[in-house]
Amino acid sequence: DVGYTVKGVLTLLHGYTNSGDDWMQMTAAPRYAADNGLVLVMPDCGNSFYQNMMHGGAYKTFVTEELPMLLGRMFKLPARREQNFIAGLSMGGYGALFLGLSRPDLYAGCASFSGAVDLSMMLADPAAPGVREVFGPVFGDGLLLPKSSDLRVLAQRVAALPAAQQPKVLLTNGLQDVEPYFILQQNDAMHKFLKPLGLAGYRRLQWNGVHEWNFWDRSLVYAIDYFLNNGYAAKKLNDW
């Protein structure tokens, strides 16, 4: 019993080397959820980029199939697409768009906060420091991004669906979020690709900020507002 009427489920995905607990410790996510009748699901998925890893766990299957089935049985959580949303930060930002666009039948909205949304940019130089260590277990020794994991390919497929079947898509990034992950550049490139597609519900927000929790806390408020279309962000402005 969460103490309020449950209106929906919001799955929050963590960043690289982080865990689901960070959302509880570093943001006001529980308060935002209570304000809006949302149940939070915050899985731990290692450094998987939310893939069915080449050398590791099947995390896409875990988040989109196994975990919802388990939680539905245990807690009778809402299963309707219209009541399910997914968001994440950094690696989890990519993950939220990857899962949301891969399974538009499951999620009514997906949001990336400071997301590593252009993995082709990150994989461009396999000899760069850390690339093989980070992505080898995920995509294999060839370090090739499969079409099934490419957000551009997935977005094109979603854009071809009827508007009512497309999830809302939100990108947020800080204007100073540059090195070492080039998040601004990745989001600029993805925005340039997504905007002309004519997705039924696409939005990008950016403001002064870097790769840190204050930015992601604020992004979470904007995402809830966008998903539920209830003016929640305007109500929180006085708190910022």
Predicted regions and their residues:
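Non-catalytic cap/lid and distal C-terminal segments of serine-dependent acyl enzymes
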Residues: 1-240
